[in-house]
């Protein structure tokens, strides 16, 4: 006789950091998000990046065309900041409801970020405009200097970029995305109400040992890179505390299998199919399920000044095996936790 399964009912969540790509990949991955989440902040790092209102409107339409009938999903678009971006274009997009936020990628920090910002000073007029109109700034918080160790790039970013920026523009709303270190967890926790953070499932579940000991696991390779276990533990403690300025952002970032399993593999975990159950597992392990709904469904809208979703979903606690792969037109996509047995999943 099997034990009765446990059901967890929560307000429909949102994903505050998501990569959907474009073309066939977009069509493949969108349904994995749209069946679960009400909204998602969509990253603009296409090639070429989304830097105009027209490009964002067109991209939003391509996303909506990929949403299956019966899914109620709203993509929230972002503008990719560049050294040459016109502040008026950004403000127009924000006022017209096209841009929800703008994304700062330090040049060459991650996938398709070669057009990114060379220095904060180069975009100060844009940032000043964002502060004035109340537009959130989303930050990939890593320095990219060649002499800075990859495991130190987030901590160094806080002291050399993030803190000086926030001291200069004190009213600017900032989301420190996909934080991975104790340094960042402490910084956000000790900050004011204009600073928030997202955390991915992989950074809560794993540390660099899981990626590197006993063989390299390319499907755990993402940026910012997994850190040592003391940092993982700090992130877990932050979410388990019920802190209300940290929220769900999967950073789901699909790449075809041959681009991950390569002599020079791409960074990114495609976790959209398994992320919500992964978060539930972490909260359960931390005896913090009472804070799970707020992390998934309340804290993000609260920071962005948006209403919470008015529908609900259920997760069920019963073991099931994650698919080994998902078909693409001419390759496959390997989901986060592929082939593994997981405890929680969204009830269909």
From Swiss-Prot:
Binds 2 Zn(2+) ions per subunit. Pfam families: Amidohydro_1. It is an enzyme of class 3 (hydrolase). Keywords: Hydrolase, Metal-binding, Pyrimidine biosynthesis, Zinc. InterPro entries: Amidohydro-rel (IPR006680), DHOdimr (IPR004721), Dihydroorotase_CS (IPR002195), Metal_Hydrolase (IPR032466). GO terms for cellular component: cytosol. Its cofactor is Zn(2+). Pathway: Pyrimidine metabolism; UMP biosynthesis via de novo pathway; (S)-dihydroorotate from bicarbonate: step 3/3. Zn(2+) 2 binds at residues 103, 140, 178. One of its GO terms (molecular function) is zinc ion binding. Zn(2+) 1 binds at residues 17, 19, 103, 251. GO terms for biological process: 'de novo' pyrimidine nucleobase biosynthetic process; 'de novo' UMP biosynthetic process. The modification N6-carboxylysine is found at residue 103. It catalyses: (S)-dihydroorotate + H2O = N-carbamoyl-L-aspartate + H(+). It comes from the Bacteria. The active site is at residue 251. Its EC number is 3.5.2.3. Belongs to the metallo-dependent hydrolases superfamily. DHOase family. Class II DHOase subfamily. NCBIfam families: pyrC_dimer. Homodimer. Catalyzes the reversible cyclization of carbamoyl aspartate to dihydroorotate. This is Dihydroorotase. It comes from Escherichia coli O157:H7.
């Amino acid at each position: 006789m099997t034990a009765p399964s446990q059901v967890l009912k929560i307000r429909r969540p949102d994903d505050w950091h998501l990569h959907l790509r474009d073309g066939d990949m977009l069509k493949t991955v969108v349904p994995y998000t749209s069946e679960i989440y009400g909204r998602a902040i969509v990253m603009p790092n296409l090639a070429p990046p989304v830097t105009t209102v027209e490009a964002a409107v067109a991209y939003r339409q391509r996303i909506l065309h990929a949403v299956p009938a019966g899914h109620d999903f709203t993509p929230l678009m972002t503008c990719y900041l560049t050294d040459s971006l016109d502040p008026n274009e950004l403000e127009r997009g924000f006022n017209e409801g096209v841009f929800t936020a703008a994304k700062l990628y330090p040049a060459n920090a991650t996938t398709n970020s070669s057009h990114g910002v060379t220095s904060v000073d180069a975009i100060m007029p844009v940032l000043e405009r964002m502060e004035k109109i109340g537009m959130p700034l989303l930050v990939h918080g890593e320095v990219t200097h060649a002499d800075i160790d990859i495991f130190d790039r987030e901590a160094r970013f806080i002291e050399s970029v993030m803190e000086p920026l926030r001291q200069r523009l004190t009213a600017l709303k900032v989301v420190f995305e996909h934080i991975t270190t104790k340094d960042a967890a402490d910084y956000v926790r000790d900050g004011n109400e204009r600073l928030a953070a997202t955390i991915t499932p992989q950074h809560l579940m794993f540390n660099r040992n899981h990626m590197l000991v006993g063989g390299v696991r390319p499907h755990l390779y993402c940026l910012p890179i997994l850190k040592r276990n003391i940092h993982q533990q700090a992130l877990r403690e932050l979410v388990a505390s019920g802190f209300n300025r940290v929220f769900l952002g999967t950073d789901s970032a699909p790449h075809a299998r041959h681009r991950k399993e390569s002599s020079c593999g791409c960074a990114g975990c495609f976790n959209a199919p398994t992320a919500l159950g992964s978060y539930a597992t972490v909260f359960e392990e931390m005896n913090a399920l009472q804070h799970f709904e707020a992390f998934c469904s309340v804290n993000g809208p609260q920071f962005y000044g948006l209403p919470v979703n008015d529908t609900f979903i259920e997760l069920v606690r019963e073991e099931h095996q994650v698919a080994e792969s998902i078909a693409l037109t001419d390759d496959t996509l390997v989901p986060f936790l592929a082939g593994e047995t997981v405890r929680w999943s969204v009830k269909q």
